[in-house]
């Protein structure tokens, strides 16, 4: 279908969080709101039509998720990442932040330590804190024009951690992890019995000839160690 990417839509005053919450969050409207994953393109017409068709049914009760729902995700993964995840192991949630929150609360206890890599998306700090967990930050280091893992520090902190929240690809650094980096982080976590939760929400926004790798597909160890969290609408908004 044809799409007009040149159409400019003024979203100010439409209860759009991206624009209408600038004063509350930042104290000024004189800024470009890059803080939220919300594009300014109009939703594609087939999606609008599908929403209208559903709304015309007039009843908005509890909706089941048919097998085709999970099969669509499986087909997406096959096509883009050469991965065929078992639909029986898939779980639906409202979003990645909600998934991370549920996983932290389910697989750790009060005062347990959660490993993250800074600088990173602010929710990685907030989710453990709000759940009464403690954050361990493995600071990424800039070396040879690229951000890299300080593996000595990573392993020391992994010895204390219950869960490692991996940002893959990394937000905000735009870092696409190499296979060897993912393997090493997962091996260290497996060695120290640390659950790896891989936030892969930006996996479909890869540039410069890079290839995104699902952390769970890296090795047999990864299958035992990694929970993958992904979301289609952030990259296709």
Please tell me what each predicted stretch does.
Residues 35-37, 117, 231:
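A secondary-structure boundary/capping signal
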Residues 168, 196-197:
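Residue-level marker for buried hydrophobic side chains located in beta-strands
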Residues 200:
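Walker B catalytic acidic pair
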Residues 2-95, 102:
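N-terminal small-domain helix-loop-helix segment of the aminotransferase-like
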Residues 60-187, 204-205, 209-220, 225-228:
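Conserved core of the PLP fold type I
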Residues 33, 115-116, 197:
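A structural signal for short, well-ordered beta-strand segments and their strand-loop junctions
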Residues 233-237:
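Conserved small/polar residues in nucleotide/adenosyl-binding loops
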